[in-house]
Amino acid sequence: MSDTQHSCVIIGIAGASASGKSLIAQTIYEELVAELGAGQIGVITEDCYYRDQTHLTMEERVKTNYDHPNALDHDLLVQHLSQLVKGDAVNIPQYSYTEHTRMNDVTPFAPRRVIILEGILLLTDSRLRDLMDASIFMDTPLDICLLRRLVRDVQERGRTMDSVLKQYQKTVRPMFLQFIEPSKQYADVIVPRGGKNRIAIDMLKARILHMLIG
């Protein structure tokens, strides 16, 4: 983590699915908005950059390994982050968890002083790591992640419990062990106990503010 002043601070938060990435990102966002003002900070979710699959049938889309780096368009994410750092606005794609592909809509995203990235595979790509001013890995036990994922995917994403468990056994856990967990070595900060770790939240907020003022 650099001590120099930044015109745009990019924070990357990685870790297993349902490890608390979104919660800690949203908490930091809400608390920094109160200090920096609206429009100064934004959150970008790696999930938005899942590849377009409109050319595939629904049966084929369901079989996609969404926990492998190839499922994500990191080229576009790197391009968008580079544009934002230069001061250019971008259009972030939107992804449908029920249709398993990109939606027609995009979300305009203007340059911000602070950008929080959150996603399972962010630290596996050296280009993304190079763009980050600080990187965090959420080190939450897999059994806790599975329980959270079951609740989330059934209640919020229209999944069945059986489909969630099959996906976990087939791709989620194996890909975590192959790609996500090894990427922990690239993190500047490893956060235990999930997204409600108050000490970690306060530390990250202080670090972000320090980087903004130099």
From Swiss-Prot:
EC nos: 2.7.1.48
Catalytic activity: uridine + ATP = UMP + ADP + H(+); cytidine + ATP = CMP + ADP + H(+)
GO biological process: CTP salvage; UMP salvage
Keywords: ATP-binding, Cytoplasm, Kinase, Nucleotide-binding, Transferase
Binding site for ATP: 15-22
Domain of life: Bacteria
Record localization: Cytoplasm
Pfam families: PRK
Predominant subcellular localization, coarse grouping: cytoplasm
Gene Ontology MF: a single term: ATP binding
GO cellular component terms attached to this protein's record: cytoplasm
CDD domains recorded: UMPK
Pathway(s) of this molecule: Pyrimidine metabolism; CTP biosynthesis via salvage pathway; CTP from cytidine: step 1/3; Pyrimidine metabolism; UMP biosynthesis via salvage pathway; UMP from uridine: step 1/1
Family: Belongs to the uridine kinase family.
PANTHER family assigned to the protein according to its UniProt record, in alphabetical order: URIDINE KINASE (PTHR10285)
Protein name: Uridine kinase
